[in-house]
Amino acid sequence: MLFDYINALLKKPTLRTPIWVMRQAGRYLPEYRETRIKAGDFLTLCKSPELACEVTMQPIDRFDLDAAILFSDILTIPDAMGLGLYFLEGEGPKFSNPLNTLSSIEQLKKPNVGNELSYVTDAVSVIKKALNNKVPLIGFTGSPWTLATYMVEGGSSKNFVKVKGLMYENPVYMHQLLDKLSDIIIDYLNGQIQVGVDSVMIFDTWGGLLNKQSYEDFSLQYMTKIVNGIKRKFNGKTIPITLFTKGGAMWLEQIANSGCDGVALDWTVELNDAQQRIGAKVALQGNLDPCVLYASPEKIREEVKKILSQFQGDTGHVFNLGHGISPDVNPEHMKVLVDVVHEFSKR
């Protein structure tokens, strides 16, 4: 089956500009909040294939979206490596066994992805059955650098002094960690592809913390390794891959040279500028400021039309926000967004 989302990433003809939204299955939906209560806690929600399917399908059932994204968390990999992931209400993710010594990096185990992360591939199988070819399914991972920031800091951070200190003081150990994570991620994404995801995305949430040389050495190098390591053809279909470095507008050319099919943009770069810079090489995803969804429906329509009018051509653009949708957005405003994108981009 031909999907506009896949075709846009591969620069094939589309009937309209496809749209999906980062965190489209999430707390802004009342049905998600009900499922979250039923699960008891966030990790249980992630680790139950049936519940993960339920929340993945909620935005697909409610809105006319062009893709579903697997409901999971980027930190499932470090959890499987023995770091002990847990969540505190209002504080985000924490690790009970962070990488706070050089020896802890050396001794870090490489999990058997097929066994220890089987709940993720099981969820993909359940979701694919539920989707019944209505829309494609996106698999994903965090980038090695982004995973490393949480693993070394022990959770979220305001200034990231531990991980950046390790990078500057002991780059050999940092590279050892990133290389190990890259190998695991390749296995992880290939596992998702083998059970049915139609495309994959790498979220480099914290790549924008770095300067140009550090970004190339400690983030982009390893994402490029992953791009080269995953199955790009499977079961007769092409599996496109999208990279997203939040705060990465200055490195668009380098990201586009990684071999990826799509580059996701945050809202700090103009879409027409990005298209001039890299549009000949890759498809673009983005890039409405998530806070626009707090505005009136009329303003949402106006801002969406601005972005759509910036893009030149009939394919190669996937509409999205420049980051995840906020938890307190009115779901009706999400519906306005989706409907307006389709209305104004119909070929």
Curated annotation (Swiss-Prot):
Q: Which GO terms describe its molecular function?
A: uroporphyrinogen decarboxylase activity
Pathway it works in: Porphyrin-containing compound metabolism; protoporphyrin-IX biosynthesis; coproporphyrinogen-III from 5-aminolevulinate: step 4/4
Q: What does the entry list under GO cellular component? A: cytosol
Where located?
A: Cytoplasm
Pfam families reported in the protein's UniProt record: URO-D (PF01208)
Source superkingdom: Bacteria
Which residues participate in substrate binding? R23, Q24, A25, G26, R27, D73, Y150, T205, H323
Residues of the site described as Transition state stabilizer:
D73
Q: Which UniProt keywords apply?
A: Cytoplasm, Decarboxylase, Lyase, Porphyrin biosynthesis
The catalytic activity, as recorded, is: uroporphyrinogen III + 4 H(+) = coproporphyrinogen III + 4 CO2
* EC nos: 4.1.1.37
CDD domains from the UniProt entry: URO-D
Its BP terms in the Gene Ontology are: protoporphyrinogen IX biosynthetic process from glutamate
Name the family.
Answer: Belongs to the uroporphyrinogen decarboxylase family.
Q: Which PANTHER family match?
A: METHYLTETRAHYDROFOLATE:HOMOCYSTEINE METHYLTRANSFERASE RELATED, UROPORPHYRINOGEN DECARBOXYLASE
Q: How does it assemble?
A: Homodimer.
Q: Which NCBIfam families match?
A: hemE
Q: What does this protein do?
A: Catalyzes the decarboxylation of four acetate groups of uroporphyrinogen-III to yield coproporphyrinogen-III.
Tell me what this protein is called: Uroporphyrinogen decarboxylase
Gene this protein is translated from: hemE
